[in-house]
Amino acid sequence: MKNTVLAAVLVLGFNSASHSQSTPLTEYSATYEASANGLAATGTRSLTKTGANSYELSNSLVASLVGQSLAQMNQLSAFELVDDQILPQNYSYTLTGVSRASHAISFNWDAALATSSEDDESWQIPLHSGVIDELSYQTAIRKALIADTDIGSTLSFEIIDGDEIEIHEYRRAGNEVLSTPIGDLTTVKLEQVRDASDERVTEIWLATDWNFLLVRMEQLNNSGLRIELELKSAVLGGVEIEAND
């Protein structure tokens, strides 16, 4: 639904009466540098614990040209961790600058309904177990990899996008050592699964020694535009990420 360069760059279960203990998520903050057809951008991402089982995942990106800020994108996902599963509560996306767009989702798990609004439109979407938003699914990927690091299986997620629920699938394609501004980092590479006729490509690399934090992302869209995002620095659980020994 998001057709801007910024969105291309950056772009689980019902509550119950009793809950088992969930494994806490590790807080982190990270900065990224990005590029797309000569357009430079800087990004920040952080995961913050806001309550006993509550978290906020934030993502921002500022694009500039010749030192002038052109646009800013902000994403925020507030979710709870229930029975070790991600339960989204609210999601927001805003784009300001040369282009403007907004998207918000409110999850009502008691009523099994989500209210999704995009610019001037709004929709009611029935909820079922496993549905998440366009930002918290990235935490779901990391949790899945932490639980099971066998290479070769496919990860599947149901994500609200505008007025519908889409299925996103990622295939684990092996491990790679990447050279980054931090130094060499060992990563697992994921490829988004698409139809054979779809020319779009999405590849992401996650640090195996650092809770599968996002290290790099590359996207190629139908028009041939290539977008790249790379980790510049990060602190995970109070520890600064370092290169391989």
Segments the model singles out, each with a brief description of its role:
Residues 7-13:
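Bacterial N-terminal signal peptides
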Residues 14, 124-131, 162-164, 199-200:
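Short, exposed beta-strand "edge-strand" segments with a Pro/Gly-rich flavor and a Y/T-containing core
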Residues 21-109, 147-245:
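Acidic, serine/threonine-rich low-complexity disordered tracts
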Residues 100-146:
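Hydrophobic, well-structured mid-protein blocks that either form specific transmembrane helices
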Residues 16-20:
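Sec/Tat signal peptide C-region and signal peptidase I cleavage site
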Residues 1-4:
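Positively charged n-region of N-terminal signal peptides that target proteins for export
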